[in-house]
Amino acid sequence: MSFEVIKEFENKISSFFGAPYAVAVDCCTHGGELCLRYKNIKKIEVPKRTYISIPFLANKLNIDLEWKDEVWTNYYYLTNDIIDAAVLWRPNSYIPKTFMNVSFQFKKHLALGRGGIILCDTKEDYIALKKMSYDGRHPDIPWREQDIETYGYHYYMTPETAQKGLDKLSDAIKTTPKQWIVTDWPDLTQMKVFKK
């Protein structure tokens, strides 16, 4: 299967959300991680009620974690321009000049089992994040033929997942998504792992 299907999926998703660019990744949390690494972030602000993998990034990346009481809907800001939009599914909802991370995990509206996408503004950001997701390389050139200049993290979406996304996309666009509420997640600050 060709990696061209990933580009097609990225283009259709960016068009749906109204974003100039979209970088397909293996999961939403890894998309957020790539954005934090790319922007060299030293602190994230995380709602007490969200999915647990987001605050775990602070430990993984050795950055500061600040909890916030926030009743959020569809998305929230980790930094001034990095957004966890894991549950967002609304046309033309991209917020300009941000990095929005959307999930395609099996419980999400476009349920692919696993997967995510980073919505972004510029070609420069797209290329940098794409390379980071592909072991530091350009996906269109065999890696042995490249002088790789940046670290990468092997977080790319597989062509099979992208094809599944294309196959399910029209139905996802036609159907109303679940409206998640903040109490769908527990208060993470009460968990032992965050009291250490």
Segment roles from a protein language model:
Residues 8, 30, 52-53, 124:
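Short alpha-helical
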Residues 12-35, 43-49:
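Short loop-beta-helix segment that forms the pyridoxal 5′-phosphate
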Residues 34-94:
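PLP-dependent aminotransferase-like
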Residues 89-91, 99-196:
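Active-site region of PLP-dependent enzymes
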Residues 1-8, 71, 167:
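A structural motif shared across PLP-dependent enzymes of the aminotransferase-like
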